[in-house]
Design a protein with these regions (language model features):
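Interdomain/boundary linker segments immediately adjacent to catalytic/signaling cores
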Residues: 1-53, 57
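Hydrophobic, Leu/Ile/Phe/Ala-enriched alpha-helical segments that form helix-helix packing faces
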Residues: 25, 29, 54-58, 62, ...
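Short glycine-rich, low-complexity/disordered patches
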Residues: 32-50, 64-66, 131-139, 177
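Acidic-residue sensor for enzyme active/binding pockets
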Residues: 47, 68-72, 98
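A short acidic/basic microdomain associated with nuclease active sites
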Residues: 59-79, 85-89
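Conserved catalytic cores of phosphodiester-cleaving nucleases, focusing on short active-site segments
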Residues: 85-105
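Catalytic cores of nucleic-acid endonucleases
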Residues: 99-157
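Glycine-rich, aromatic-bearing surface loops/beta-hairpins
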Residues: 135-206
Length: 206
């Protein structure tokens, strides 16, 4: 499908309130890359930094956030103290977010890699489900950074990334977005490790 060939894409799915935040999430990452002279990219980093860029995106589009804040988790009779990765409030819509980050070997066995991705998103959703807030405001988020190991570059990054994205889209989710370097510009020696972009998957608990 055509959308898998796009270098950036947003599908807010069942979470329309997330759409402007996801659009801003793409914008702030592009702004960072531009400020760094295209020598560094937001998706080069792990969970904590990825959460920070999502937080920045919410502020950029008129929301407010809290990061890594102390809260209570679990059933009220078995409350325990913990931390929530990110709270977003925008136009009276709240999201209490627990996030995970992972690298996915884009050239690995598709079935195995998709199982890993689904498992990590399940973990994020599970963590969100024990937050003491309304069920509809709980949100698990997974940041997935695909990578191509040295010596494993495809003949066509465009084709390969499109196929990889189609696979990732089969993982059950409520919303999805991604950002990639322009694929026609992707190149490098086979000895280089390449991480060309990032995917965000979000899902609410059942």
């Amino acid at each position: 499908m055509k959308q898998y060939r796009k270098d950036s894409f947003i599908d807010a799915g069942s979470l329309p309130a997330l759409k402007p935040i996801l659009r801003s999430w793409i914008d702030v990452q592009l702004a960072y890359e531009h400020a760094m002279g295209h020598d560094d990219r937001a998706w080069s980093y792990r969970e904590r930094t990825c959460v920070g860029f999502l937080s920045a995106a919410a502020w950029q589009c008129g929301g407010v956030t809290l990061e890594e804040w102390r809260t209570e988790k679990g059933p009220k009779k078995q409350t325990r103290h913990g931390r929530c990765d990110l709270y977003i409030c925008r136009r009276n819509q709240e999201f209490f977010i627990e996030a995970k980050h992972m690298y996915s070997r884009a050239t690995g066995r598709s079935e195995r890699e998709l199982t890993y991705i689904a498992r990590q998103l399940d973990r994020a959703v599970g963590d969100a489900s024990v937050l003491q807030c309304e069920r509809s405001t709980q949100l698990g988020v997974l940041f997935v950074a695909p990578y191509y190991p040295a010596g494993k570059h495809p003949d066509s990054f465009d084709e390969h990334i499109s196929e990889w994205l189609q696979g990732v889209a089969t993982v059950p989710h409520s919303a999805m977005a991604w950002l990639y370097q322009p694929r026609h510009k992707l190149h490098g020696e086979q000895a280089m490790h390449i991480s060309p972009g990032i995917v965000l998957l979000a899902r609410t608990p059942k």
